[in-house]
Amino acid sequence: MDDARARRDGRAQARWEGLELMKTTPWGFRDILPEEAQAREEIAQTVAGCFKSHGYLPVETPLLEDKSSLDRGGRITDTPFKLFDDDGRLLVVRPDNTLPIVRLVSTRLRDAALPLRLRYEAPLVRAQPRNSGAARQFTQLGFELIGEGGDAGDVEMVSLVIESLQALGLTSWRIVFGSVRPFMELLARCGDASLSSDVLSLVHANNLVDLDTRLAQSSIGEPLRRAISELPRLHGGIEALDRVDELAVLAGIEEPLTGELRALVQRLEQRFTKAGEGAGAAPDAAGAQAGKAGSTLSSSEAPFGLDGALSFDFSIMNSFDYYTGLVLKVYAGNLPDPVGTGGRYDSAFDGVFPELDRVPAAGFAFSLERLEGACTASEDARDASADHAVARAMEEPLRIAVPKGSLNAGTIAALEAVGLDVSGLRDPGRHLIIHARDLRGEVAGGEISEGGTTAGSETEGEGASASARLAGPSIGDVEFIIVRATDAPAFVAGGGADCGFCGRDSLIEADLGLLELVDMHYGACRFIEAEPAGRAGAADRAYARRGCLRVATKYPRIASAWYESRGIAADIVTLHGNIELGPIVGMTDRIVDITATGTTLRENDLVITGELMECTARFFVNPGRARLDARVRMLADRLAAYAAVRGQRG
């Protein structure tokens, strides 16, 4: 009896030890517990019910897809999981649900009657920066409308999105429209395939600063260069569409490029106004705050249509390049990440259906995880609205990440120059958050100078109010959060700040898809490769012998990309300080580091062997906040004017 019990106990212990090894999930993946799973189920059923009521039929596709077939459908870059099957085919765990449905329709439903209305609920995985807190697996609730083009298809797609948001009871949402067509028309006039590829990659990466640098290096004419540079910066209401068409004319394009967007908004307004529904949406907290008297946006800057629930932003370039026209992102719950994305992809089925050269198609997908977060945020907002004091506290100031260290003085000078109160930043003590305000309502001017003064004259009339004397709208209250420059991108990406400042290097290393808007022209330094002067040639000999270089750096992503671009194999050793010691003590062959004056290199007897890039401070924003809160763009415009003065003066 005792022996049998001992054997059972031994087996139980072995099973427990096995479970101990499985007690955590891989990074970027997590378990869903019953309470959350039930909430997700209810959301999924509600959304699926909306899709089903409009005749959308369910389909399912495999989790694994042949990579070559997906590549033929569009640009696929964020596929973290790849494997070979027994036949030697390269398979991927799908990062997208639209392309598998394109494959399904192309192979199994070619003879189906059009239009096809399909829906799905399916998980997918996408690459994310390690230790960023971002999930690598999420579930999409989506639909595809195949065979219905033009205004009718666009209106059906967007209307179904609106109905789904209403069915979920979301009281605060925003739909932001863009279009791929204007940008592609401009690129078609470049006549330079390499330039077009580089420009498209930079816009996909939200890097508008390097976009300007690349355009300046090109030989295209000034009107076209200006149009390409300005287009992804355009945002707002109908006036943004007017400016798109103006830029097109300047670039030699006579046909208006915004007709589809104008028609879409007009039909949506007619449909929902006629139905007596309105949008069912109140402007989100940022929009509501921006609409308060005295400190607000002009009518041209405020969101328009469906009670402020619609706007345009031509920086929207969805991550997959199969889109051909309308693209859109949906925000809800005043959260910075979109709860859904979609658009039109009219070329995906070219030649697929008999006797039809082109079959239009459009689709949209909600993120179940983000919808659940938005629903929770909306419920919290409704509960808080019952308490007036709590509701007032929820009107948050614009939050700006201010770096410590070498960029601190330049950042304070820039913020002061554009009219913000920086007195608390000069000696913050141990405070991590500094409360401040925009001083524009307290001065009579508005013309920005490099030195931080404001010039101008008071409007006529002794009784003119402060708001009447403003050269532009006030940003209102702000909060400065004091962070390390290397941490600023994480705070902005994670919603801890709306915007911030850091070096170009920190943005590259973080790789969080933030929107880079302004080169601030301070904090200049160079990225260099260096080695000990007394061992000149040793690194080359070691490379010839080993086939790789050993390199110490604090910037592994930048260093790896540079060596890869030169076809050099390099083993990167990541250090966090005293990088120069790597080759001095014989741990590495060379270093990759920053230098401003070269003093540290000389003092440690290091000589430069390569130049990687130049680096300056940049103003960057959370893309969602830039689309939801016009104060972010207002600050960016002021900073751009200030930086332009600095750039002109060298």
Q: Which residue ranges define each predicted feature?
A:
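Intrinsically disordered, low-complexity terminal tails and inter-domain linkers enriched
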Residues: D3-E17, T273-F304, S378-A393, R437-I475
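Auxiliary tRNA-acceptor-end handling modules of aminoacyl-tRNA synthetases
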Residues: G18-E36
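Positively charged, Gly/Ser-enriched RNA/tRNA-binding surfaces
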Residues: E36-H54, E65-S68, I76, T98-D111, ...
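Polyanion/phosphate-binding surface patch
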Residues: V59-L91, A134, F527
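Beta-rich nucleic-acid/ligand-interaction surfaces
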Residues: T61-D78, G178-A188, I316-T324, E580-L581, ...
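Short, glycine/charge-rich beta-strand/loop segments that flank catalytic centers
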Residues: T61-S68, L116-A127, R174-E185, E509
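Acidic, His- and aromatic-enriched active-site or binding-groove loops in soluble protein domains
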Residues: T79-D87, D192-D212
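Domain-level signature for soluble enzymes in the chorismate/prephenate branch of the shikimate pathway
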Residues: G294, H388-G650
